[in-house]
């Protein structure tokens, strides 16, 4: 693994000069190995180690290099065609392969090669980009988007039109992470490496980036870039110091534990916020 990482790091330093025509065999093989490992879930761009999320930047570099070494090619897609550098994950799959992998894909859902989809996941007509990791028993609902290298936990529901941001550019950014047992409401957007911690419920139409204030109304505390575990979050506003205007924020209206969440439906949690 160390030699593979070194090959990627070395090639990335020379990326501006690399083209599909001149890429050397060592670099091509290293990039292809990484993409295959991301595709199978053997490697992932970020993982939780000792309670903290760690981003493996070299894997993101490999994903970026994959665009340097590939020409656009014709991609068949049912009644239409596409033209891109990255093949589709399910190209060439037959019924037996889908049954073996153990998840459902509803047309016209699109998943790029290099994204991992775990068992018992349901992909409605949605989009999952390269480098993403979608864990077991998750629902990616209609028109939801899982961006490049985003990490989605177990038993997550990404509602219709929800967007989970990708982070290949800028490279130093960490991936957006949705931990286990979270609910992301319709048309909400979590971007710029935001972490939504385990068991949180995000209401419809909530937008959170690194600069978004996440206001806990019970404590008055303001968080940035992280939704604490078990939070129920809605969109809101905070007044300016002089009271002349207000600016958008996300508001933590309550905290719930796993026991409460198991007994109470998501809709009820969001309706009883007063």
Curated annotation (Swiss-Prot):
Pfam families: Hexapep_2, THDPS_N_2. Its EC number is 2.3.1.117. GO terms for cellular component: cytoplasm. It is found in: Cytoplasm. The keyword Repeat applies. GO terms for biological process: diaminopimelate biosynthetic process; lysine biosynthetic process via diaminopimelate. It catalyses: (S)-2,3,4,5-tetrahydrodipicolinate + succinyl-CoA + H2O = (S)-2-succinylamino-6-oxoheptanedioate + CoA. SUPFAM superfamilies: Trimeric LpxA-like enzymes. Homotrimer. PANTHER family: 2,3,4,5-TETRAHYDROPYRIDINE-2,6-DICARBOXYLATE N-SUCCINYLTRANSFERASE, MOLYBDENUM COFACTOR GUANYLYLTRANSFERASE. This is 2,3,4,5-tetrahydropyridine-2,6-dicarboxylate N-succinyltransferase.
């Amino acid at each position: 693994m160390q030699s593979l990482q070194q090959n990627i790091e070395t090639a990335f330093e020379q990326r501006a000069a690399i083209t599909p025509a001149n890429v050397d065999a060592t670099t091509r093989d290293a990039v292809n190995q990484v993409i295959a490992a991301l595709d199978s879930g053997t490697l992932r761009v970020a993982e939780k180690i000792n309670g903290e999320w760690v981003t493996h930047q070299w894997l993101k570099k490999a994903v970026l290099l994959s665009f340097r070494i590939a020409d656009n090619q014709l991609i068949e897609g049912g009644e239409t065609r596409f033209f891109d550098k990255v093949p589709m994950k399910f190209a060439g799959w037959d019924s037996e392969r889908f049954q073996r992998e153990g998840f459902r894909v509803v047309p016209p859902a699109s998943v790029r090669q290099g994204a991992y989809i775990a068992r018992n996941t349901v992909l409605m007509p949605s989009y999952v980009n390269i480098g993403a990791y979608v864990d077991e028993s998750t629902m990616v609902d209609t028109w939801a988007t899982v961006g490049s290298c985003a990490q989605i936990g177990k038993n997550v529901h990404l509602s219709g039109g929800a967007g989970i941001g990708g982070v290949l550019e800028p490279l130093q950014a960490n991936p957006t992470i949705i931990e286990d047992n979270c609910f992301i409401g319709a048309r909400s957007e979590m971007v710029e490496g935001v972490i939504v911690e385990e068991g949180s419920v995000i209401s419809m139409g909530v937008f959170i980036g690194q600069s978004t204030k996440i206001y806990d109304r019970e404590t008055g505390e303001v968080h940035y870039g992280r939704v604490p575990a078990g939070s129920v979050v809605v969109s809101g506003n905070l007044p300016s110091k002089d009271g002349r205007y207000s600016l958008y924020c996300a508001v933590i209206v309550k905290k719930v534990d796993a026991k409460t969440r198991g007994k109470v439906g998501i809709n009820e949690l969001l309706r009883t916020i007063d």
